[in-house]
Amino acid sequence: MTIDISEASSSRFARIREGELDLQLHYNDLGEGAETVVMLHGSGPGASGWANFSRNLEPLLAAGYRVVLMDCPGWSKSDPIVCRSSRSDLNATALKGLLDMLGLERVHILGNSMGAHSAVAFALANPRRVGKLVLMGGGTGGASPFVPMPTEGIKLLNGLYREPTIDNLKKMMNVFVYDASDLTEELFQTRLDNMLSRHEHLDNFVESLAANPRQFPDFGSRLAEIQAPTLIVWGRNDRFVPMDAGLRLLAGIPNSSLHVFNNCGHWAQWEHAEPFNRLVLDFLQH
């Protein structure tokens, strides 16, 4: 069965008023399944739900899930914002507002990098609203005892926010994945166009870092509170968030398992899309 999937036809906007937040969020809404999977993207310049997860949608939809991709505040077509406190909690608050607006009481959450940090923040604040968690390349802040911080990848990411050029984008993306030969000029140009189309997002991220360099707090002391079944996925060659962070999540979350992809960087769901999709479907269905 061929499933019609397009960004334009699934594009939606919602006004979110939750706590101190009052902003317009963009999201994509696909499928009509009884169970919903929410996908949260990472913090790279030009990121969006669609750009992060376009290789992972069809298997979930074919399996009967509804899929919601949220563009976090300050990214893509969502409203700009300066975050002076916890970005993880800000995104979790925005997600709660979106789920309330959509009438979704309980969802599975799949988060990549910043999206994983935000998924953990949401699960801690709203434990009864989480079915299962999938955390890729993130889930808690905190320093690595093995890798100098900030990591090589994060330095390049922050540099790209300050100087959004095609050369700086290529430098970051070449570290983002294990095999840079998979990156195309079309991908680079699409990402650059998305970055430059909302320059205020770039400026606001730099201002946010200046106001609070620790945008993503260390949830280590609270991980044991998470009761949701959790699948942790990491790339062994991740140069943005080192793999020991995944081991900390595994040790802290009681009902969790860890899958490590070899020859894989920070973008497991894109670099190893087919085995990743099988892994996630098996986890969600059993």
Swiss-Prot record:
Instruction: Name the pathway.
Output: Aromatic compound metabolism; 3-phenylpropanoate degradation
Q: Name one Pfam family in it.
A: Abhydrolase_1
Q: Where is this site: Transition state stabilizer?
A: 113
Superkingdom of the source species: Bacteria
Which GO terms of the cellular component aspect does the record hold? Answer: cytoplasm
The active site lies at: 266 (proton acceptor)
First-tier enzyme category under EC: hydrolase
Question: Keyword annotations for this protein?
Answer: Aromatic hydrocarbons catabolism, Hydrolase
InterPro entries of this UniProt entry?
A: AB_hydrolase_1 (IPR000073), AB_hydrolase_fold (IPR029058), Epox_hydrolase-like (IPR000639), MhpC_alpha/beta_hydrolase (IPR023791)
Enzyme nomenclature, EC number: 3.7.1.14
Q: What catalytic activity does the UniProt entry give for this protein?
A: (2Z,4E)-2-hydroxy-6-oxonona-2,4-dienedioate + H2O = (2Z)-2-hydroxypenta-2,4-dienoate + succinate + H(+); (2Z,4E,7E)-2-hydroxy-6-oxonona-2,4,7-trienedioate + H2O = (2Z)-2-hydroxypenta-2,4-dienoate + fumarate + H(+)
The GO molecular function terms of this record are: 2-hydroxy-6-oxonona-2,4,7-trienedioate hydrolase activity; 2-hydroxy-6-oxonona-2,4-dienedioate hydrolase activity; protein homodimerization activity
Task: Return one Gene Ontology term, BP aspect.
Answer: 3-phenylpropionate catabolic process
Q: Which residue positions hold the site described Catalytic role in ketonization of the dienol substrate (substrate destabilization)?
A: 191
What is the stated purpose of this protein? Answer: Catalyzes the cleavage of the C5-C6 bond of 2-hydroxy-6-oxononadienedioate and 2-hydroxy-6-oxononatrienedioate, a dienol ring fission product of the bacterial meta-cleavage pathway for degradation of phenylpropionic acid.
The subunit structure is: Homodimer.
Family membership, please give it: Belongs to the AB hydrolase superfamily. MhpC family.
Database matches in HAMAP family: MhpC
User: Protein name, please?
Assistant: 2-hydroxy-6-oxononadienedioate/2-hydroxy-6-oxononatrienedioate hydrolase 2
